[in-house]
């Protein structure tokens, strides 16, 4: 391998928009700003909203279910 071709892997601080500061290591070599982190992301805070409006199969059956029905004489 060639010597001195790899970037320096240094400790940096990543600051979230909520104010949380995370110490990590990177080759970026400058402070990093984040939009979300584990302290403010809705999935990790329990404030996630789930939208259950019916699946694709239910929608398909409601639109095309009558086409496969047999007719009574």
Curated annotation (Swiss-Prot):
UniProt keyword Secreted present: no
Keywords attached to this entry: Metal-binding, Ribonucleoprotein, Ribosomal protein, RNA-binding, rRNA-binding, Zinc
Cellular component aspect of the GO annotation: ribonucleoprotein complex; ribosome
Keyword rRNA-binding: yes
Required cofactor names: Zn(2+)
Ligand binding (Zn(2+)): 16, 18, 37, 40
InterPro entries per UniProt: Ribosomal_bL28/bL31-like_sf, Ribosomal_bL31, Ribosomal_bL31_A, Ribosomal_bL31_sf
Domain of life (superkingdom): Bacteria
Signal peptide: none
Cofactor note: Binds 1 zinc ion per subunit.
Alphabetized GO MF terms: metal ion binding; rRNA binding; structural constituent of ribosome
GO biological process: translation
PROSITE patterns, A to Z: RIBOSOMAL_L31
Known function: Binds the 23S rRNA.
HAMAP family with a match to the protein in the record: Ribosomal_bL31_1 (MF_00501)
Family: Belongs to the bacterial ribosomal protein bL31 family. Type A subfamily.
NCBIfam families: L31, PRK00019.1, PRK00528.1
Subunit structure as annotated in this protein's UniProt entry: Part of the 50S ribosomal subunit.
Name assigned to this protein: Large ribosomal subunit protein bL31
């Amino acid at each position: 391998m060639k010597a001195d071709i790899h970037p320096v892997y240094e400790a940096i601080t990543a600051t979230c928009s909520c104010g949380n500061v995370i110490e990590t290591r990177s080759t970026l070599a400058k402070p990093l700003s984040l939009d979300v982190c584990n302290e403010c992301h809705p999935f990790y805070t329990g404030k996630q909203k789930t939208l259950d409006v019916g699946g694709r199969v239910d929608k398909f059956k409601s639109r095309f279910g009558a086409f496969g029905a047999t007719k009574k004489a």
